[in-house]
Amino acid sequence: MEKISRTKIVDLMKREDFGAMVNVKGWVRTRRGSKQVNFIALNDGSTINNVQVVVDLANFDEEMLKQITTGACLSVNGVLTESVGAGQKAEVQAREIEVLGTCDNTYPLQKKGHSMEFLREIAHLRPRTNTFGAVFRIRHNMAIAIHKFFHEKGFFYFHTPIITASDCEGAGQMFQVTTMNLYDLKKDENGSIVYDDDFFGKQASLTVSGQLEGELAATALGAIYTFGPTFRAENSNTPRHLAEFWMIEPEVAFNEIQENMDLAEEFIKYCVRWALDNCADDVKFLNDMFDKGLIERLEGVLKEDFVRLPYTEGIKILEEAVAKGHKFEFPVYWGVDLASEHERYLVEDHFKRPVILTDYPKEIKAFYMKQNEDGKTVRAMDVLFPKIGEIIGGSERESDYNKLMMRIEEMHIPMKDMWWYLDTRKFGTCPHSGFGLGFERLLLFVTGMSNIRDVIPFPRTPRNADF
């Protein structure tokens, strides 16, 4: 076979030098035709679009042609030709074909459609489908957008540890890391495990957030962001929860809650705009195949300012809805941690645009959030989105050493684990703010997928750690 430099299909579709010899490589999506001519849809993953390879059967070995089945991997040399078919600008008239890899007839991805549940069982193969090819290309582009946004704004990308001895959220739902023999654990007289001989000499876990360490960096570098994996050992089998997911967490010195809200709104609009501008084919495919309102919803986020509303006002709106006959599964009252149905009512039914809810009761928020003058609420903010509910959670951080100490004691957090965090309030404290965005929740919104397990390559959920 003549050696010709490979052209990615995404680039081939932009070429207009018809008559040129080209090489394309990829996997067979479909093969159809007559006794004289076959049409092979070839895809290499660079785009949602296939290239049509036209094969004059008289010019090729019959035994080789038998190997060209759905899923087979081919290298094709041929002439780039202007296509007469609808929906494609160019096709390749095959001159030489090499089968790089045959595909066994047990290949589970055939032309017929497959359920999402089935595709999760074969997560190692599902990136080959149109749907997951689109999702994972968008995932890549969203990661690029995140780094680009923060770099352009002068933030520093800061790497926080995956293994930690602190519980940022105070929830205690952490995966433990140990080298100890689980069948022969050393315990003290109270029956508590002794970690002196463990690898780190203390109890260690996988991180639930890089925020606390991010705050340390922000009080030195000014503006930082983290972007990495986080872990929650919650036994939650829902379409919105994963045990392993990715988080983006900016922290900014001297920003108060207002600037924090401004940053969150600007950031998420940037990401949505990036998806529309740079993933148009993939977004359109997902809009047409899964969620007919996807593009309209994405464009809607960009059109208007987000509503900014105190938690107390949000509760009043929800209580008025109940009084008028609206039924929620979970009760509404001041002090409740809002459920997704409450958040979505505010966004989808009442305001019909994204909402930033602020000033939450301190009892339902984390210890590090700055307390308001009323003593009841904290300067927290949650960004609520249509279809998703909460997509961003953040706050202005408590910068007063004594108030932070008091809050840590109130929540019975061991002081021995917090000395390093308190040092930032002891040595040149400053106002600072930040937030966390669950990457997969952003992807749920941008792709229109309905289950968070379908926007991460290999989902980690209770009783599932395959691949």
Curated annotation (Swiss-Prot):
**Gene Ontology MF annotations:** asparagine-tRNA ligase activity; ATP binding; nucleic acid binding
The subcellular localization recorded is:
Cytoplasm
| InterPro entries xrefs | Aa-tRNA-synt_II, aa-tRNA-synth_II, aa-tRNA-synth_II/BPL/LPL, Asn-tRNA-ligase, Asp/Asn-tRNA-synth_IIb, NA-bd_OB-fold, NA-bd_OB_tRNA
The top EC class, named as a word, is: ligase
Per the record, the GO terms for biological process are: asparaginyl-tRNA aminoacylation
Catalysed reactions, as listed in the record: tRNA(Asn) + L-asparagine + ATP = L-asparaginyl-tRNA(Asn) + AMP + diphosphate + H(+)
Could you list this entry's UniProt keywords, alphabetically sorted: Aminoacyl-tRNA synthetase, ATP-binding, Cytoplasm, Ligase, Nucleotide-binding, Protein biosynthesis
Q: Is Aminoacyl-tRNA synthetase tagged as a keyword?
A: yes
| E.C. no | 6.1.1.22
Instruction: Cite a single Pfam family from the UniProt record.
Output: tRNA_anti-codon
User: Has keyword ATP-binding?
Assistant: yes
- One GO cellular component from the entry? cytoplasm
Q: What is its main location?
A: cytoplasm
Q: Which domain of life is it from?
A: Bacteria
Give the multimer and partner information: Homodimer.
Q: According to its UniProt record, which protein family does this protein belong to?
A: Belongs to the class-II aminoacyl-tRNA synthetase family.
Q: Know the name of this protein?
A: Asparagine--tRNA ligase
Its lineage reads: Bacteria, Pseudomonadati, Bacteroidota, Bacteroidia, Bacteroidales
